[in-house]
């Protein structure tokens, strides 16, 4: 994976002439998890260098797919993905490779609280994985979602040349409106990832580990009763690593590039 290049003109054309003419249900057709995105079937995901992309830079965008947040994946595919990518590329990120994930609630017995795409460089393949996300639309009344599943997968099931060759951390962004699940139960990791661990994993400890190779951020939809959730996120991640977005997500096209560009280190031969 990771071949091809991103064409913002072609992507923008598809957004306006294809995706914007469709309903959310027509774009996101999945009625269950796509087998290619099922973490139980995935041993490892890789972001690798190639002759075409010698300085790969991994970016994970993990989207809350529960009932209150389905408008954000829709917004990204219909409106803002070309703007996000164009901003990143124009700012000098040479070889961005983007993975989309879907995040739900593993405490509410969702079918697919974690869905994992591939790292891609081309517009068509990024769109392929984004539209494969199953918008399960559930989530419970427990006031949190299982965002740490994205951290766990990145920490245990992703390898990148950016880190192994250049000690360049990737960027991992979760987007949602709930608080963060405090503990991943070992039974949940077994059920949804086929990973057998000896004990439950405290999310704050997991965060310490994943931060060794990833710059971790959260973009928070901060409307109404969800304002308290942002405070919880700030206590966990730290000030400046949690960014509030408009309820309609209209400013996400500016927020995501800003976070990414703040972490990117240009190759030495480009400086």
PLM features: what roles do these ranges have?
Residues 6-60, 67-74, 78, 86:
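Acidic, polar low-complexity linker/tail segments
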Residues 48-53, 89-92, 156-167:
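Surface-exposed acidic, glycine-flexible loop patches that form ligand/cofactor-binding
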Residues 52-116, 121-169:
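Von Willebrand factor
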Residues 63-65, 151, 169-181, 185-188:
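DG-centered beta-turn motif at the end of beta-strands
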Residues 111, 159-162, 181, 185:
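Extended, composition-driven regions rather than compact fold-specific motifs
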Residues 178-231:
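VWA/integrin I-like adhesion module and closely mimicked acidic/polar interface patches used
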Residues 222, 236-271:
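C-terminal helix of von Willebrand factor
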């Amino acid at each position: 994976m990771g071949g091809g290049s991103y064409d913002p003109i072609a992507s923008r054309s598809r957004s306006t002439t294809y995706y914007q003419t469709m309903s959310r249900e027509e774009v996101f057709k999945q009625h269950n998890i796509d087998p290619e995105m099922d973490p139980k079937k995935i041993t490892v995901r890789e972001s690798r260098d190639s002759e075409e992309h010698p300085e790969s830079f991994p970016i994970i965008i993990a989207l809350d797919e529960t009932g209150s947040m389905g408008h954000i994946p829709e917004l990204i595919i219909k409106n803002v993905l070309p703007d996000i990518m164009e901003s990143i590329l124009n700012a000098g990120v040479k070889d961005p490779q983007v993975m989309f994930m879907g995040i739900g609630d593993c405490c509410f017995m969702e079918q697919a609280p974690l869905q994992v795409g591939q790292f891609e460089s081309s517009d068509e393949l990024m769109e392929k994985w984004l539209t494969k996300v199953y918008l399960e639309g559930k989530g419970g009344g427990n006031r949190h979602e299982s965002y740490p599943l994205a951290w766990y997968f990145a920490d245990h099931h992703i390898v990148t040349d950016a880190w192994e060759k250049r000690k360049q951390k990737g960027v991992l962004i979760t987007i949602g409106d709930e608080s963060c699940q405090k503990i991943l139960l070992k039974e949940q990791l077994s059920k949804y990832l086929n990973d057998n661990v000896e004990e439950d994993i405290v999310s704050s400890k997991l965060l310490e580990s994943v931060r060794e190779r990833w710059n971790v951020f959260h973009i928070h939809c901060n409307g109404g009763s969800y304002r308290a959730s942002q405070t919880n996120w700030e206590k966990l991640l730290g000030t400046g690593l949690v960014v509030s977005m408009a309820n309609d997500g209209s400013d996400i096209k500016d927020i995501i590039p800003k976070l990414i560009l703040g972490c990117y280190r240009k190759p030495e031969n480009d400086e």
